[in-house]
Design a protein with these regions (language model features):
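N-terminal loops that bind phosphate or other acidic moieties
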Residues: 1-191
């Protein structure tokens, strides 16, 4: 983005706080149908980002997003490191020369979500992170179309993400470890 004064650190701290406040839930969900390492991988990625806080503070917004992606790729285990890393690298590339506005944020986030779809060869309805991210992205796009205030757009986005996450409970998994469980994956929310 052209406004280099945007700091990513408050977002990283907010994500860390959210992960930590839901740590037991994340661990429980992943142990039920996943590899059981999702929480550890998320925490490892966030800790690596915070170790790079001085460097991240010196970068403009688009470069910081790209650096976040590269850091997540190199520090998080499992598929999520590659997927989240790809998302942030793509968002960084998309953010270059964009003004700070809801339309830009929507475009940047949507590009990141699309990169996960491409890398993971997945889509909504397959009991993956995309069942949360695609509704969040769609909500943000709709808010942009209706020229909503940012705070309202983000609240709508959060609600769409929660509803998307909850929708995975009755889905049959087609990707990841959960796909090997067949019908036994039903009744569990994807972590």
């Amino acid at each position: 983005m052209s406004d280099s004064s945007i700091s990513v650190l408050p977002f990283i701290h907010a994500i860390k706080d959210t992960i930590n406040s839901h740590a037991d839930e994340i661990a429980h969900l992943d142990q039920a149908i996943g590899d059981g390492d999702h929480l550890i991988n998320l925490q490892r990625g966030i800790d690596a980002l915070l170790k790079n806080r001085d460097e991240l503070e010196q970068l403009d917004f688009s470069a910081a997003l790209s650096k976040i992606g590269l850091t997540l790729m190199s520090t998080m285990g499992g598929a999520s490191g590659s997927l989240f890393g790809s998302m942030f690298v793509t968002m960084g590339k998309t953010a270059k020369e964009k003004p700070v506005a809801l339309e830009s944020i929507s475009e940047i986030f949507t590009a990141g979500v699309e990169s996960i779809k491409a890398r993971g060869k997945a889509d909504i309805g397959e009991k993956t992170m995309l069942d949360t991210l695609i509704p969040a992205s769609t909500s943000l796009q709709e808010s942009m179309t209706h020229e909503a205030e940012l705070s309202i757009a983000l609240e709508s986005m959060k609600q769409a993400a929660i509803e998307g996450m909850e929708s995975t409970e009755d889905m049959l998994a087609t990707k990841g470890r959960a796909s090997f469980l067949g019908e036994r994956a039903r009744g569990h929310i994807d972590a």
